[in-house]
Design a protein with these regions (language model features):
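Conserved ABC transporter NBD signature motif
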Residues: 15-26, 30-31
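ABC-family P-loop ATPase nucleotide-binding domains
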Residues: 37-94
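Helical segment within the ABC ATPase nucleotide-binding domain
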Residues: 121-134
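C-terminal coupling/interaction segments
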Residues: 192-241
Length: 241
């Protein structure tokens, strides 16, 4: 729903969504040519990929055929593809490649790893990383947090329309440690735990300024279970007020 509001496909009951100071509800060409939405479910016409590109790329001034070929290569595909002969997972790879090749400044992706097999998910991470730049914002909505935790630089966690967490990954990792341990004493100090084969995954206060990779599953569980405690770690005054 949030992504559809951001793209102007849904209209908010209150307030408005702006993109470069323009209300997205107006659906102006100058707005539409600079954003792209990859929905969770979609259909592609039974035509060749070359024809699809010829029909749709003119709507996006910054589309690059060279980029399209590069992104397809990540998924071991090429331009000589008949869209009607593809599986759902293959169609998603083609559509995401086209989306990234449009070079819009805003790319919205809803559950992009759904329908991808294990090799496809690994390819997806490399694919997204290759398309990142300072000129582009990529917003990914997902419940498959393990598929994307290593490519994010900012995390937004929402629950029933309430924003519980909105922080850069660097800030999060400076506040918390994410480790796996069977140490019972260490487990007692954890903010949040999840069972693992070797004991527990632990989310701990980062009191020694150590560096660990973010565990989104732990962070998500902790934020939903104790939102006030997590908010206080970043914004103490919010709780005091």
């Amino acid at each position: 729903t949030l992504l559809y509001l951001m793209s102007g496909l849904l209209t908010p009951r209150n307030g408005r969504v702006t993109f470069y100071d323009t209300d997205v509800r107006r659906r102006l060409p100058v707005t539409l040519q600079d954003m792209f939405l990859v929905p969770e479910e979609f259909e592609l016409p039974s035509i060749s990929l070359v024809s699809y590109i010829e029909l749709n790329s003119p709507f996006y001034p910054h589309f690059s055929k060279e980029d399209m070929m590069k992104y397809l290569h990540f998924f071991e595909m090429d331009l000589s593809t008949d869209l009607g002969a593809l599986s759902m997972g293959q169609k998603k790879k083609v559509f995401m490649s086209f989306a990234l090749a449009t070079n819009t400044s805003l790319l919205l992706m809803d559950e992009p790893t759904n329908g991808l097999d294990i090799p496809g998910k690994s390819q997806f991470r490399k694919f997204i990383a290759s398309g990142m730049s300072d000129e582009r914002t990529i917003v990914i909505s997902t419940h498959q947090v393990r598929d994307i935790d290593r490519i994010l630089d900012h995390v937004l966690i929402m629950d029933n329309s309430r924003v519980l967490l909105d922080e850069p990954v660097g800030n999060i990792c400076s506040k918390f440690l994410f480790v796996e341990s069977d140490d019972r004493e260490l487990t007692k100090t954890a903010i949040y735990t999840l069972p693992s084969v070797q004991g527990n995954f632990l989310m701990l206060p980062n009191t020694e300024n150590e560096e660990t990779e973010i565990n989104l599953e732990l962070l998500f569980g902790a934020t939903l279970a104790e939102p006030e405690k997590i908010i206080q770690m970043f914004h103490p005054k919010t709780i005091e007020q």
